[in-house]
């Protein structure tokens, strides 16, 4: 029964995404210098440079063409062990805006994990929009 529900959710997601241009992953990882949970929308190069400096001050920011794209991202914040991740799984045009869908995963209870601080994040480029951007956390299929 759970498999049927999961398959239905995937099918619905695919149907809702039909006609929406794909997202492009700019960077994803577990070692951001942004150690608080936050979602971001970046529409110009000045904002991008500022965000990138907070996220990874020791590296140059990846190129983004803000005349046609914008960057959306999710920072999970500081977590106590390895095994935490965040992934932007898609986006939907929603009237005058965009809904960005993301999934967080965490280690299973009792799992053996490296005892290191992590700060998972995912930054993606999507076609530029002028409306409001909202973020929706979706359930893991695990």
Annotate each language-model stretch with its function:
Residues 1-2:
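N-terminal secretory signal peptides that target proteins for export/translocation
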Residues 6-15:
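Bacterial N-terminal signal peptides
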């Amino acid at each position: 029964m759970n498999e049927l529900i999961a398959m239905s959710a995937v099918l619905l997601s695919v149907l809702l995404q039909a006609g929406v241009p794909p997202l492009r992953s700019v960077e994803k990882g577990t070692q951001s210098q942004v150690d608080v949970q936050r979602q971001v929308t970046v529409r110009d190069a000045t904002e991008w440079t500022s965000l990138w400096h907070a996220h990874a001050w020791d590296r140059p920011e990846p190129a983004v063409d803000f005349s046609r794209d914008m960057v959306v991202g999710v920072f999970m914040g500081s977590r106590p062990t390895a095994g935490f991740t965040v992934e932007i799984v898609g986006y939907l045009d929603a009237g005058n805006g965009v809904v960005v869908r993301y999934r967080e995963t965490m280690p299973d209870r009792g799992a053996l994990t490296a005892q290191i601080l992590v700060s998972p994040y995912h930054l993606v480029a999507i076609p530029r929009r002028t409306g409001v951007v909202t973020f929706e956390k979706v359930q893991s299929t695990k």
